[in-house]
Amino acid sequence: MSHLVIYNEEGSVLELIKEYEAVSKRLAALGVRFERWKADNELSWDAGQKEVIKAYEEDINRIIKEFGFKSLDVVSLIPENPKKDELRNVFLKEHTHSDFEVRFFVDGSGTFYLHIDDKVYVAFCEKGDFISVPAYTKHWFDMGSKPFFKAIRFFLIPEGWVADFTGSDISLKIPSHDDIASL
């Protein structure tokens, strides 16, 4: 179940929210869009990019029209991937983007950490969750030690994901995806 955990910068829990509407409302107050999408038909894990896009075509077109995205892709990662640790470590570093970061979880799960003011808002996302992180928001992403997810990524610029790392070590103070998933 998707949920939101709010921490102080030292890693102490301030609040745990498990109800979808309350999670969505709290994130909206921060400028973060959080929605639930449903596929037009059931997808297997092996579904390719065309099948995935077709299954969520209505929501994808709505978001593209609203924000003017120039490109999108479908990415996936499984525990057996030999580069999983390398990929995880890149995303675990706090960073910002000059553009907002938009993801939709087709399957599996991942956790977005939003460092806003003196709090860290931890959004555990799973199948059916759409999240949009505002531009210049300090954040990081954890896919866990055994990553399993498939996601649609939306981009305004053809280059896609361009990060500006903050150099902060705050991600070491906040529990990992594996810990958050167990709440």
Curated annotation (Swiss-Prot):
The record marks 103 as: Important to generate the dianion. Its EC number is 1.13.11.54, 1.13.11.53. Pathway: Amino-acid biosynthesis; L-methionine biosynthesis via salvage pathway; L-methionine from S-methyl-5-thio-alpha-D-ribose 1-phosphate: step 5/6. It catalyses: 1,2-dihydroxy-5-(methylsulfanyl)pent-1-en-3-one + O2 = 3-(methylsulfanyl)propanoate + CO + formate + 2 H(+); 1,2-dihydroxy-5-(methylsulfanyl)pent-1-en-3-one + O2 = 4-methylsulfanyl-2-oxobutanoate + formate + 2 H(+). It holds the Pfam family ARD. The record marks 94 as: May play a role in metal incorporation in vivo. Its cofactor is Fe(2+); Ni(2+). It comes from the Bacteria. Keywords: Amino-acid biosynthesis, Dioxygenase, Iron, Metal-binding, Methionine biosynthesis, Nickel, Oxidoreductase. Ni(2+) binds at residues 95, 97, 101, 139. Belongs to the acireductone dioxygenase (ARD) family. This is Acireductone dioxygenase. It comes from Hydrogenobaculum sp. (strain Y04AAS1).
